[in-house]
């Protein structure tokens, strides 16, 4: 990208950006929630739309001069509705967490009971963690996975729901490698007359391309981020049934946000447009293929995969049998140029700052052009680094750098 002005006005900051640019260029990015946006997304993000205040919604703003940003937001909303066949869309949430907060606030009262997936079983902070606003403002009860299969125990979920009769059931996860049965959860919600919310932040790209069943026909509310598998700018969005549209929109503005970030909404419109193209479907198909191959190769090296494998874009790995913690594995792999994150596993025995596992995913490396052969090499690099962690691993670091050079991040930047 062109940094001519920044070079002249703030070389100190530019130096930091350049160092991060180099890190992204020469590291294998396996954090499941990260991806690389297109240059078009970044151009929209860096546009003069950042100058415009636009409190309110298109054609009902509290400021003048909004006729063109109205067009931008309308375009983003229409593309998002088309992408997921939804009745209503709100593209103003600054993040997935704020999208979730707005849904809770739209139909619930403080102190209401909500059923959400346990964080250590693959849920998310905003699904009821006691350190998060969700756990502080609402009475969250957790469900999780079966100890044997390590997949969601729907019978137990139903039992907990019948015993506690929550006002809402939240599904979706941040570290769950299997298909989620939204129809089954809808049936449980209907039995207890509860709202159904799905946080599809991680799997939105899979849903958009038919690689994971869509929650939209079943859920009252669906939230997502725009920067994971959707490959857009950092931000959030909400889809809902038309009957909840006013309540959701009011919860975002004036409920928890003021002016929307119009440059980000423009970038969201770009990413939704990209996701509607055929080449995006091919990309997501390759993500799933890559994840399966990476998982099988790691199993061949003796790594234990939670639930035995994957149906989506991520793998959750139990490192107990490798005699290394998630924290140490993250640091070790980072030293050779592979970026992962430590992650709790179901029925975790260690602290969330240490963890028994790591979470990895293939969306970012697939964006670069990595395919099955590269997945086999990544599995080899990971295994070799962990098995020979007391040795000099400079040759692995060099091999990783060479692979990254073959697949430059932004060839035309």
UniProtKB/Swiss-Prot annotation:
Name recorded for this polypeptide: Serine hydroxymethyltransferase
GO molecular function terms noted in the UniProt entry: glycine hydroxymethyltransferase activity; pyridoxal phosphate binding
Reactions that this protein is recorded to catalyse: (6R)-5,10-methylene-5,6,7,8-tetrahydrofolate + glycine + H2O = (6S)-5,6,7,8-tetrahydrofolate + L-serine
Function, as annotated: Catalyzes the reversible interconversion of serine and glycine with tetrahydrofolate (THF) serving as the one-carbon carrier. This reaction serves as the major source of one-carbon groups required for the biosynthesis of purines, thymidylate, methionine, and other important biomolecules. Also exhibits THF-independent aldolase activity toward beta-hydroxyamino acids, producing glycine and aldehydes, via a retro-aldol mechanism.
Binding site for (6S)-5,6,7,8-tetrahydrofolate: 119, 123-125, 351-353
Superkingdom classification of source: Bacteria
Keyword vocabulary terms for this entry: Amino-acid biosynthesis, Cytoplasm, One-carbon metabolism, Pyridoxal phosphate, Transferase
Requisite cofactors: pyridoxal 5'-phosphate
Enzyme Commission number(s) from the entry: 2.1.2.1
């Amino acid at each position: 990208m062109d940094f001519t002005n920044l070079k002249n006005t703030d070389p100190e900051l530019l130096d930091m950006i350049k160092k991060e640019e180099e890190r992204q260029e020469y590291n294998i990015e396996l954090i499941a929630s990260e991806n690389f946006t297109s240059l078009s997304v970044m151009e929209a993000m860096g546009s003069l739309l950042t100058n415009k205040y636009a409190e309110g919604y298109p054609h009902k703003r509290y400021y003048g001069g909004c006729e063109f940003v109205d067009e931008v937001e309308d375009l983003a909303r229409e593309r998002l509705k088309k992408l997921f066949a939804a009745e209503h869309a709100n593209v103003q949430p600054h993040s997935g967490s704020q999208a979730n907060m707005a849904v809770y606030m739209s139909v619930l009262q403080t102190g209401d009971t909500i059923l959400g997936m346990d964080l250590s079983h693959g849920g998310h902070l905003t699904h009821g963690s006691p350190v998060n606003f969700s756990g502080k403002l609402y009475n969250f009860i957790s469900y999780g996975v079966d100890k044997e299969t390590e997949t969601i125990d729907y019978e137990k979920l139903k039992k907990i729901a019948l015993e506690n009769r929550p006002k809402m059931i939240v599904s979706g996860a941040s570290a769950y490698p299997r298909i989620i049965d939204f129809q089954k959860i809808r049936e449980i919600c209907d039995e207890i007359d509860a709202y159904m919310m799905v946080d599809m932040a991680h799997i939105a790209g899979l849903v958009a391309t038919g690689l994971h069943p869509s929650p939209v026909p079943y859920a009252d509310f669906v939230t997502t981020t725009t920067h994971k598998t959707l490959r857009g700018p950092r931000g959030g969005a909400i889809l809902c049934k038309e009957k909840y549209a006013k309540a959701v929109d009011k919860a975002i503005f004036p409920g928890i946000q003021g002016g929307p970030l119009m440059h980000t909404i423009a970038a969201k419109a770009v990413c939704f447009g990209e996701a509607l193209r055929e080449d995006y479907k091919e990309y997501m198909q390759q993500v799933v293929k890559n994840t399966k191959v990476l998982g099988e190769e790691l199993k061949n090296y003796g790594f234990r995969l939670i639930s035995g494998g994957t149906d989506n874009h991520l793998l959750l790995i139990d490192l107990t049998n490798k005699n290394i913690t998630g924290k140490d594995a993250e640091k070790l792999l980072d030293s050779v140029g592979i970026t992962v994150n430590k992650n709790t596993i179901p029925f975790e025995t260690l602290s969330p700052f240490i963890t028994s596992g790591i979470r990895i995913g293939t969306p970012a490396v697939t964006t670069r052009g990595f395919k099955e052969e590269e997945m086999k090499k990544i599995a080899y690099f990971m295994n070799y680094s962990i098995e020979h962690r007391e040795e000099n691993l400079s040759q692995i670091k060099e091999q990783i750098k060479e692979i990254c050079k073959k697949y430059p991040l932004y060839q035309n930047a």
